[in-house]
Design a protein with these regions (language model features):
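Glycine-rich phosphate/dinucleotide-binding loop and adjoining beta-alpha-beta core of small-molecule
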Residues: 1-156
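Short, small-residue alpha-helix embedded
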Residues: 107, 163-194
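Short, charged, surface-exposed loops that flank catalytic or proteolytic processing sites
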Residues: 110-120, 181-189, 207-209
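A short structural micro-motif
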Residues: 115, 194-197
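Feature representing long, continuous alpha-helical segments
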Residues: 122, 152, 171-172, 185, ...
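Short pre-catalytic strand/loop immediately N-terminal to key active-site residues, enriched for Gly-Thr
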Residues: 153-165
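Charged C-terminal helix
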Residues: 197-225
């Protein structure tokens, strides 16, 4: 199975939204055509948090989300976009899953991080019921919620995963599982478990501080092999 990318030439800080980089009018269909799952995130610096990239990033993400006709995993700048365009979730035609950490979910809900962490299951369940999506709320015990009220809590994971880039791997694993036919609830569950177990194994070999997110894909491959 091959992963295809729709790169944007604005990861460089010196490029800005006014530089005339248009979103191809067929971008959503180009990304979705012939594919079984989409992942909306970013690689490297969160371009949606930069003034010069925000407008273009928002245009790209909105077009992809509204045009998606395959299950979609929304992470990083996809979540940043939804913080000010939350109703797009209700208008999506395909199933969607969000993978926020508590601070990102705080931006989406207006609830404080402490309140979210005190009521993780309730918050996740209420969000998915309101917006009709799936949610993976990251944390020491990741909570996975479905819009029909089902909730699962992972039993794998460790502090080795609390690093930038770890969540990108998780979103990719979930997307890969969904592309192979898992429904999003199961893809989130299996993906979170594999991600957490891989982190545990790496922490044993390299220590929690020495383990790197870039080592996770290979370790997940070992677990599956």
């Amino acid at each position: 199975m091959q992963a295809d990318f729709l790169p944007l030439p604005l990861w460089n800080r010196q490029l800005c939204a006014g530089s005339g980089v248009p979103l191809p009018c067929n971008a959503p269909s180009a990304v979705c055509s012939g594919h079984r799952c989409g992942v909306v995130q970013r690689r490297g610096e969160a371009v949606g948090q930069l003034d010069e990239g925000m407008a273009v990033a928002a245009e790209v993400i909105e077009a992809l989300l509204r045009g998606a006709d395959v299950p979609t995993v929304i992470d990083a700048d996809g979540i940043n976009f939804l913080a000010s365009h939350i109703d797009v979730l209700k208008e999506m035609q395909a199933p969607a899953a969000l993978t926020p950490h508590p601070m990102e979910l705080s931006r989406l809900t207006g609830c404080g991080v402490e309140e979210i962490n005190r009521n993780r299951v309730h918050t996740a369940r209420a969000f998915t019921a309101e917006y009709g999506c799936y949610l993976l709320l990251k944390g020491s015990r990741t909570v996975i919620a479905a819009p029909d009220g089902r909730v699962r809590i992972t039993v794998s994971g460790c502090s080795a995963l609390a690093k930038g880039g770890s969540g990108d791997v998780l979103a990719g694993v979930v997307g890969a599982l969904a592309a192979q036919g898992y429904d999003l609830f199961d893809a989130l569950t299996v993906g979170a478990f594999l991600h957490g177990r891989a982190g545990e194994q790496l922490a044993v070999r390299f220590g929690a501080h020495g383990a790197l997110p870039s080592q996770l894909p290979e370790e997940i491959g070992r677990l599956l092999g």
